Each structure stands twice: as structure tokens, then as C-alpha cells.
Amino acid sequence: VNEEVVVYGAVILNGEPKYKKLVGNWITDGDYYVIHRFATLPSFQREGLARIFISKVNSMCEVEKIPSIKVDTNFDNTPMINLLSSMGFCICGRVNYGGNRGQRFAFEKLSIAMEPAD
């Protein structure tokens, strides 16, 4: 917005090795996009920009035929947990990064590529 980065996230194909050691069960076992380091400037929070960002990732999945999107977040990150839940993400378990990062909730959502056609 006005040449200022207001939303940032890294979108990586199959890019989280810790997800192989999930305490829980993923919905899918195939390719996925992971969203990491996701942030919105405080002055732009609650304006729907995070929702738009995640929707764009879902569109990428449709074009590239990637079955799902995975995200992890801190247990106390209520805004992100609520956003993911409202967008159809399911809590699949916990991922442990160790050290200061510790454990986090792990979410997954089937992408548009996996939704049945009408």
C-alpha cells in the first residue's frame, strides 16, 4: 500500500522438514504449500489483507495442482488461529521446533485443486 509492505509471508513448496514429525495426522500426504513468517503491519490488521494473501496461495494451488496448504502458529496466536479456522483450515496436531520456538499448532486445508467440481 503506497509502496509500503503491509503483509508478508513466505510461501514454500514442501518446505518444512519438521512437518514429517507431526504429533497428529495430516489430511494429505502429498505436495503442499507452507506459509511461514506471516505478518501484517499492526495498522493494517483486521482489514482482510491476511485473508486475501491466503486466498492467493489457494489460487496458486489450483493453478499448480497442489493439494493442500499447511501452516503452523503459536498456541497463543488467537488472531491467526481464528483466521485459519474461519478459512477452513483444520488443526491436525502439533509440530515441535525445539528451543525457543517450541511447539506450535499445525493446520492444513485442502486447496481449491482438491475441491470437487460442481
PLM region spans:
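Short beta-strand micro-motifs in enzyme catalytic cores
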Residues: 31-33, 101-108
